[in-house]
UniProtKB/Swiss-Prot annotation:
It is an enzyme of class 7 (translocase). GO terms for biological process: mitochondrial electron transport, NADH to ubiquinone. It comes from Sus scrofa. Its EC number is 7.1.1.2. It comes from the Eukaryota. Pfam families: Oxidored_q4. Core subunit of respiratory chain NADH dehydrogenase (Complex I) which is composed of 45 different subunits. Interacts with TMEM186. Interacts with TMEM242. Keywords: Electron transport, Membrane, Mitochondrion, Mitochondrion inner membrane, NAD, Respiratory chain, Translocase, Transmembrane, Transmembrane helix, Transport, Ubiquinone. One of its GO terms (cellular component) is respiratory chain complex I. Core subunit of the mitochondrial membrane respiratory chain NADH dehydrogenase (Complex I) which catalyzes electron transfer from NADH through the respiratory chain, using ubiquinone as an electron acceptor. Essential for the catalytic activity of complex I. It is a multi-pass membrane protein. It catalyses: a ubiquinone + NADH + 5 H(+)(in) = a ubiquinol + NAD(+) + 4 H(+)(out). It is found in: Mitochondrion inner membrane. This is NADH-ubiquinone oxidoreductase chain 3.
Amino acid sequence: MNIMLTLLTNVTLASLLVLIAFWLPQLNAYSEKTSPYECGFDPMGSARLPFSMKFFLVAITFLLFDLEIALLLPLPWASQTNNLKTMLTMALFLLILLAASLAYEWTQKGLEWAE
């Protein structure tokens, strides 16, 4: 009997809360609530917004470096070698390669945000 009373109480309270959640927002509807929110952009404007090519290049560079770090950096530890010197040499070589490519991007002004 106690289980039935508990279940009935829980179902009643849950149903009451769901009904309140559906009815309460409809009582004070105003124009800003009914308009779609598009991250600050006008939803009725042009869908072709200007796109910064510099942003695209910086994003692609970030993705390339991120993939290099995620895929190449664990390689020395995954090579199943017992020689610590070989593993550390491989890791150091990969870090030097990443640092050199970052320096190259920097000197070519690939990381400059402003034009």
